[in-house]
A protein has these predicted regions:
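N-terminal secretory signal peptides
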Residues: 1-27
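N-terminal secretory signal peptides and thylakoid transit peptides that target proteins
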Residues: 20-40
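Short, well-ordered alpha-helical
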Residues: 36-37, 41, 54, 59-222, ...
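A short helix-breaking turn/cap at a secondary-structure junction
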Residues: 121-126, 318-398, 462, 466-469, ...
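Short helix-loop capping/hinge segments that flank enzyme active sites or metal/cofactor-binding pockets
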Residues: 122-131, 204-223, 381-388, 423-509, ...
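Gly/Ser-rich, acidic/histidine-flanked active-site/gating loops
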Residues: 136, 141, 169, 205, ...
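Glycine-rich, small-residue loops and helix-cap segments
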Residues: 150, 205, 245, 249-251, ...
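Short glycine/serine-rich loop/turn segments
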Residues: 203-342, 528-533, 560
Length: 611
């Protein structure tokens, strides 16, 4: 029979071996062994200690009771989680929190703060274009005016867009699922309602496309991955419901880069209509390409960190990345509960305002959402606005706005907070896609507990230390992003300590506060096109993208939203875009300023020769 000393020596050996097991089960096993080791030690020393046998027995008994209560690994099976279940913690961009924001709005505006103001579309005047291409490239708010005046029908413009999709999509590759029959039925229903005097508002009968991250009942929702090409939801995302209730006509599910990154998806790369030799950037790659090509009146994109801004710039269109929490993400694929946003991608700033007026507002299915005022001002005066400009701001954009009455002031570098480590995004990625990683690991024989390299951090902890993905395994094998993007993106956050994640969130709130201080004397600012994509994404500030000149672009390589490694492309002339960043919840103001610029210029009216 083993003596307590024998047991002690064996437990010491077992505990040393268990120290290398990083799994949850391994942690439970180490805890069990630790308590057992302490109990054995107490028993050993109690038995050998002269005059202390009673105390030793007492200690062994007490610790034995402790180990009996805590020694066994938990037998409860955790509730399975998919992609959509949100954590209890919610990010709020307003430094004082939701309650303080609501009190401020009520104090300043009363009940009007929560009123939903429909966008007022100007009446159509003049001749109606007879060329289908001219109709297709009209801004969405002009198509709306024509439909309301019954100068064209929803079915007419829907058929024009469907014909253009059939013609251009084989080259541009922006459609994942074409919904032609459903679109025609929705257009006919819209025409019947309008003829009967039941006009729903400015989006009634206007055709659009939506990024294939959003659930549409009975329609495949692929997230850019062939692993999910047969995923057919039985419900509609909130944005789909709002747009349907507004009478908009859904033409197609538009491409998203694989799991919302880049412009590659399981159907290949989505291309830029201004230059089909390059991608349209991502991850809202289909919305960017389809809108620029005149194949939808407007589209809906999403962004975690650059995925609206980057494809809007790449394709030379107008777009709004709204203040965090203004549009519901319910029914959309999750990458980050604390950074994901939904916004319109359009031909003009007024189009963005018209669409956003329908999209925004609180939704009980998305706890991050709030209702705040939105009032687009078509005739805004720039004279009284506090506008900041930095040295990298596009000269053409600044000079035109100055000529319209803007008096800019110089601003310096935007606030940063050291040590944020991406704000914990990898942890959110890993949590949102744990269900998928577990499944894929089983398919290819990847041991998630054995590939971790504790000497490295973040994604790198899994980089060179994980087995190579077998050739041809997985539906993304044709995607050049897959080798780099499949596992590290969702694996890196699995090893983060809860302590580190909380510290990141504390630093993020410091960043939010610093930005609040920086913006307190500004209504908006203009900087270089990509200067603040990262910090803005973490603080929740809104920005508008707009073309400000026509020239040969110099798109940078690498980084989020850039093309996969390839020979340097030859760029061709296209609209070049700038970015206007606003204060929290001033989405209406930055779109109104962008509209003043577009009234004075025509860069947003240019069309790709290919289309």
């Amino acid at each position: 029979m083993d003596t307590p000393l024998d047991m002690l020596e064996q437990l010491e050996a077992d505990l040393a071996a268990a120290d290398h097991d990083e799994s949850a089960t391994g942690v439970d096993r180490r805890q069990f062994m630790f308590f057992s080791l302490v109990a054995a030690a107490a028993s050993t020393f109690g038995a050998r200690g002269a005059g202390a046998q009673g105390a030793g027995a007492q200690g062994a008994g007490a610790l034995g009771s402790l180990t009996r209560g805590a020694a066994q690994p938990p037998q409860v099976t955790p509730v399975a989680l998919g992609n959509g279940e949100a954590p209890a913690l919610q990010f709020m961009p307003y430094p004082g929190g939701t309650g303080a924001l609501m009190e401020k709005l009520v104090r300043e505006k009363g009940a009007a703060a929560f009123a939903r103001t429909p966008h007022a579309v100007e009446k159509w005047s003049g001749a109606v274009p007879t060329n289908p291409d001219d109709l297709a490239f009209l801004p969405a708010h002009r198509i709306s005016a024509l439909i309301k005046a019954r100068k064209i029908t929803s079915r007419q413009i829907t058929d024009i867009y469907l014909a253009r999709i059939e013609k251009l999509n084989p080259t541009l590759n922006f459609v994942v699922t074409l919904m032609a029959s459903q679109a025609r039925a929705e257009a006919d229903a819209a025409d019947a309602e309008i003829a009967a005097g039941k006009y729903r508002g400015p989006l009634h009968g206007v055709p659009y496309g939506i990024k294939d991250l959003f659930a549409v009942k009975g329609v495949p929702t692929t997230w850019g991955s062939a692993d999910f090409k047969d995923q057919i939801p039985d419900y509609d995302a909130d944005v789909v419901v709002r747009l349907r209730e507004a009478g908009a006509v859904l033409l197609a599910k538009l491409a998203t880069g694989l799991f919302a990154q880049n412009d590659w998806w399981f159907g290949g790369r989505t291309n830029n209509p201004w230059n089909t030799n390059i991608g349209s950037s991502g991850s809202s790659t289909g919305p960017g390409s389809a809108t620029a090509a005149g194949c939808v009146a407007f589209s809906i994109g999403t962004e975690t960190q650059g995925s609206i801004v980057s494809p809007a710039i790449r394709n030379g269109i107008s777009a709004l990345r709204p203040t965090f929490g203004r549009v519901s993400r319910h029914g959309g694929m999750v990458l980050s509960w604390s950074q994901d946003r939904v916004g319109p991608m359009c031909r003009t700033a007024e189009d963005c305002a018209m669409v956003f007026s329908v999209l925004h507002g609180a939704d009980e299915k998305d706890a991050s959402t709030v209702t705040t005022p939105f009032q687009f001002d078509r005739n805004l005066s720039l004279a009284s606005l506090r506008i900041g400009v930095d040295s990298a701001a596009p000269k053409e954009l600044v000079d035109t706005l100055r000529g319209l009455g803007m008096s800019p002031k110089e601003i310096g570098a935007r606030p940063t907070v050291a040590g944020m480590q991406g704000g914990g995004l990898n942890v959110e990625y890993a949590a949102a896609f744990d269900f998928y990683v577990q499944r894929k690991a089983k398919e290819i024989g990847l041991d998630l507990n054995m590939v971790y390299d504790p000497t490295r951090t973040g994604n790198g902890a899994y980089g060179n230390n994980r087995p190579a993905r077998p050739a041809g395994v997985g539906p993304e094998a044709t995607n050049p992003m897959a080798a780099a993007d499949w596992n590290p993106r969702f694996l890196g956050g699995r090893t983060a300590r809860g302590f580190e994640f909380v510290q990141n969130q504390r630093r993020r709130l410091l960043l939010v506060s610093k930005w609040g201080e920086f913006m307190k004397d500004l209504d908006l600012f203009i900087a270089g096109p990509n200067a603040d994509v990262g910090p803005n994404a973490q603080t929740g500030h809104p920005c508008a993208v707009l073309p400000y000149k026509f020239d040969v672009p110099q798109f940078g390589g690498g980084g989020r939203g850039a093309d996969a490694a390839a020979p340097a492309p030859v760029y061709k002339a296209q609209p070049i875009c700038g970015v206007i960043t606003g204060n929290l919840y001033n989405d209406d103001l930055i779109l109104s300023v962008a509209h003043q610029f577009q009234k004075a210029t025509d860069h947003h009216t240019k069309r790709p020769s290919f289309a």
